[in-house]
Amino acid sequence: WAEWTTTERAALYEFDFTDAGRQANVLFRVGSEGEVAVDGNRVVSGWESVDYARQYFYAVADRPFVSSGTYDGTALSGECSASGSGIGAWLSAPAGFGKVCFRVGISYIDVEQARANLEAETGGLAFDAVKERSRAVWEEALGRIRVKGGTDRERRIFYTSLYRTFERMVDQSEGGRYYSGFDRRVHEDARPFYNDDWMWDTYRNLHQLMTLVYPERQLEMVRSMIGMYKEWGWLPKWELYGRETFTMEGDPAIPVIVDTW
């Protein structure tokens, strides 16, 4: 079986190979152009390119596997690093390997920042402790609206929908820094920097909801929009991975800013 829990910039994966009846294999796939490296049958790190950004990762298992390597397409290799597209890394152990936990940090800045994010957000906490802390964060966020009446199904639909409003925007800040695809630089900023907003739709009602229920979050989103303007000269329409996609017409950021004010 497998379990997964997350923080904002990190995740913990628990695998149990005790009763698998075959060898234990874990694969790390780099889908687009990128690099991957394996260290000591336990650590995997690398990056893949996405539009105007790179997504870096650092992963460490709580116990070493027996063997490891990389692959290019379908060809397995014992080499400790690989680069290109369609590459990845693998770790393997005999049947009955038992339980193993991977801690994975991500970053738009570099591998070291991914490692720092992992340490800052999970530290030495056990899987269940991270899961409970994550649950508490969501309880606080969703608990700002209390529903009276309705059926269990209706309340479940409501809170599921409220949960999904947090899909956009994304806090891209990392330890007092953030990467911007607008000018392709790393900026120093101690406050949150939000990105990735499908604003041709979200300007209609999502930002109004944030203004009413999560005003501190909405203010930082608007501050981030103004920051994007300062970086490249225009307010955003649909910014993705830290750059403008030029997908939609109009100026949806203007009513968002006015509504927030």
Question: Regions from the language model: what does each represent?
Answer:
Residues 1-194, 227:
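Beta-sandwich/jelly-roll carbohydrate-recognition scaffolds of carbohydrate-active enzymes
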Residues 195-261:
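Aromatic-rich carbohydrate-recognition surfaces in CAZymes
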